[in-house]
C-alpha cells in the first residue's frame, strides 16, 4: 500500500512526514520545497505563486502538471485524480484542507460528491492538528477512536436516515430526528462506534 501525502493550500501548521509520495497542490508545492520535503507531484493552476516561484516548482518537481485556471475540478480534486490514476490502492492524507478559502474547504469536505473520486472515498483522510475527517459509503461501518480525540460528528450526504450505536448519544428508530450534521457526540471508553446509512455517503 502506497502512503501519499497531499499538501493543499490551506493552513499547514501541523503535518507528518511518514509517507512514500508527496504531492503539492498549487502553493502547497512551494511549502514542500521550503520544508525540504520531496516534491514527487506538483499539480494545480499555480495562480497563487509568483513567476519565480513557479519556475522553482517546475525545476524541482518530479512530475509537474499545470492546469488551466478555468477548469471543472479544484486543484485538490485534480491532484487526487492524478494520484489515484497512478496509485489506485493508495491511502491518501490531505494536509492544508482547512483554513484557507472557505469554498475550497467546502469542496474538500464533499470530495466523494465527485463521481471520479467516490470509489476512493475510504482511501482519503483530511487531517490537521485538531481534526480527522474520513468518508464512508452507504451501509454499516465501525468508526474507530483516534488517540487524543474524544468528540465525533457525523454528516450524511443526501436524505437517508442514519443510525448511531455505541456512542454517548445513540440514534435509532426510537429517538430519530433529522439533522444535516449530528455534532459533538463522543466515544465511550475508546470503543468503536457503529453507524449505518441507507444511501449516499457519510462524512
Where are these regions (language model features)?
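Long, charged alpha-helical interface segments
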Residues: 129-131, 136-203
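Anionic-ligand-binding alpha/beta catalytic cores of soluble enzymes and soluble regulatory domains
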Residues: 91-139
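Short gly/pro/ser/thr-enriched loop/turn and capping motifs at secondary-structure boundaries
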Residues: 29-31, 49-51, 73, 101, ...
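Short coil/turn segments at beta-strand junctions that form active-site/ligand-binding loops
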Residues: 1-2, 20, 88-91, 122
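Short beta-strand segments
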Residues: 6-8, 26, 95-97, 127, ...
